[in-house]
Structures are given as C-alpha cells and as structure tokens.
Amino acid sequence: MPKKFQGENTKSAAARARRAEAKAAADAKKQKEPEDAYWKDDDKHVMRKEQRKEEKEKRRLDQLERKKETQRLLEEEDSKLKGGKAPRVATSSKVTRAQIEDTLRRDHQLREAPDTAEKAKSHLEVPLEENVNRRVLEEGSVEARTIEDAIAVLSVAEEAADRHPERRQRAAFTAFEEAQLPRLKQENPNMRLSQLKQLLKKEWLRSPDNPMNQRAVPFNAPK
C-alpha cells in the first residue's frame, strides 16, 4: 500500500490565508468607520466653535471702536461748549453708515422745511366772495323799494344761485324712492317691483320734491 500523504495542501493553506486576511481587513475597516465618523463630526464642532469665537471677537472690537468714537465726539462737543479748542485726535477717514444717514436726514429736513419768508395771507389779502344779490341788482338794474320788489329780487337771486338743479336730482330721487316705495308696495301688493318703480317715476315727475319742478315754482307761490 502506498503511504498516506501527511503534508498540508499548499493551495488550501494559501486560500485560507487570503480569506483570513480579507476578513481581518474588513473587520478593521468596520471598526475604523465609527472612529472616523466621530473625528469628522468633532472637526465640524471645532470649526463652528472657532467661527463663533472669531465672530464674538469681531463684535467686541466693533463695540470698542464705537465707544472710542462716541467718547471722542463727546469730548469735542464738550470742548466746543467750553470755548476751548478741540483736542487734536487722529481720526479715521472712514465714515460710518449712521453718520451718512444722519447727514441725509438733516439735509432732507432743511429742504422740506417751509420758507419762513412765506406767510399766510391776511384777511385783507383774501378776495371777498361776490354778493349774489348785489350782482343781480347790478345786472338786472332792479331796486327793491317795496316788500314785493324785495321778494322778486330774492327769487331772482335764488334762481341765479341754483342754475343746475339736475345735479341734485339723483340724491333727491333716492330720498323720494326710500320714502314712497314702501307706501306703493302696501297699496299695490300684486304689482312687481318694475311696475312699482314705473308708478314711482310717474309720481316723481309731478312731485314738488323734484328739483326740476322746484325751479319752475315762483318764490311767493302758495304752499
């Protein structure tokens, strides 16, 4: 009988070694991923922290600069009030936005302010309104010597003052309709609204409330 081979198969050993190496690499990668993620996240926090620190320092420096500028302006103002010379301080040529806005606002107020030389017109400068009755007398050469003449003059003056009754006709008709339409509905319950409005219009043409009819009525006509 031939002897049994007791040595190790090199191919099998190499395959097992490769599998073990691949498994070890996969395990190492798997273990490293959480650590990398942790440090990556920690780097973000560090960057944000540094950014906040820089912004805070910038705000502090800006506030300090504004305080120095305010103090300088107060010292200059105080020196001017006392009549002394303002201290010679090396000022920055940079103009702040607040100073620009303040200058523009003052300039706008000066432009919008009314001219002090322009005064309100006195009662002597305002033209007097024309007396209608006097104009009627002058134009028509009517002189009121009696009561009847005065009534006639007033009637002419009233007619001259109200030459456009049609301008008041719409408002007068609206008031007439609101007052008379309920009565017509009660007296004619079977009529439609269009019929009632036709009837109302006929009454309006004859009504003394119509400005067109008032124009033709003489001033001293009996009521």
From Swiss-Prot:
GO cellular component: centrosome; cytoplasm; midbody; nucleus
Sites of Phosphoserine modification: 141, 194
Biased composition (Basic and acidic residues): 18-74, 99-126
Localization: Cytoplasm, Cytoskeleton, Microtubule organizing center, Centrosome; Midbody
Region (Disordered) residue spans: 1-126, 204-223
Coiled-coil residue spans: 44-82
Subunit structure: Associates with translationally inactive ribosomes in the nonrotated state. Interacts with RASGEF1B.
The family this protein is said to belong to: Belongs to the CCDC124 family.
Name of this chain's protein: Coiled-coil domain-containing protein 124
Gene: CCDC124
